[in-house]
Amino acid sequence: GNRGNRAAQALAEACRTGREPELSVLEHERFVLLYPEILLAMRVNNFLEREHITVENALYTTNATTALNLTAENYGFCFVNETAVHNAPNRGELLFFDLDSPDLVHPLSVVYKKKRHLLPAARAFVDAARRFLQSQSWRSECDCRVEHGRPV
């Protein structure tokens, strides 16, 4: 969410004071969402349904960077993969919340042709990606991490 948005500020304040953030504050907010046929959007829709949050006002895009840019301009809240936090444009205008929900887990695969020699650069990429994602160092870039209903 945008740092100037009241709902985002309420969520951040709950995190700062050690209270569980009430996602119900998002109920009447605008959202910048990915089109529903995109896999991440399907996961977000499932999450919102489980949290009983009805989206009444949404702008749709195919691109997460566009969603972040629009959120930075306070056009609404968006959902992005955790790794998007690191490279987010207009980082200073945004508040990031790691919701740590199984509904939002988005698998990542590296696919290459079987029985082919993997080039050293490709192997280095796979190893670097695995180390980065397993280290969860990206989590430190979130403004608030909610783990099993408790702010961390």
Task: Mark where each language-model region is.
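Residues embedded in well-ordered beta-strands
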Residues: 5-7, 32, 77, 95, ...
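Residues at the C-termini of beta-strands that transition into short coil/loop
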Residues: 1, 35, 98-100, 114
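Secondary-structure junction motif
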Residues: 15-23, 27-51, 118-127, 133-144
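Hydrophobic hinge/microswitch elements
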Residues: 37-96
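A bilobed periplasmic-binding-protein/Venus flytrap-type ligand-binding module shared by bacterial periplasmic
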Residues: 1-2, 7-12, 108-118
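C-terminal effector-binding regulatory domain of bacterial HTH transcription factors
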Residues: 50, 82-91, 101-152
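Low-complexity basic/metal-binding stretches
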Residues: 1-6, 15-18, 145-148
